[in-house]
Amino acid sequence: TLKNGGLVAVDMTNGTKKWTYPTTKGDAYFPIADKNGNVYFTEKGSQTVHAVNASGSKIWEKNVGNNLNYSGGALSTDGILYIGTQSNNKVLGLDITNGNIVFEETVGQQVMAAVSIGPDRRLYCGTIGSNNIGSIKAFAVNKTLATDSWSIRGGDIQGTNRQK
């Protein structure tokens, strides 16, 4: 049993619990697995990104100094985990081998939904600003915001990827 929250791995062949990984503050948000079975996730109510291996053992934990509520990750083919932050309005890129921050960009509003990587290698993130007006922002994955980046305004997209 996970008293405070955490991550549970389930055997997909029979539905039994394989392992658990407890967290200290809250639920595991938006777990994403790489080709080796390593799992990366954020934790509700914390500033920590976790990486665990396919057996449920810790690889690394990284305090990114920003609130990660509602933030999920996108894993690039070059081994970067992109996540959005609620505080400080940033998208961060973490090296999946060690958790070091290798990309950091301020997007101007709270990131309130998982970051996605499109087939065009752009990052897409849902943000929310004043009066709960949401936006979707897109920018190139070239370590800086591209001049041809764009943004679209919509409704309240807190915790979702929906567009009104």
Language model features with spans:
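Extracytoplasmic/lumenal domain signature
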Residues: 1-164
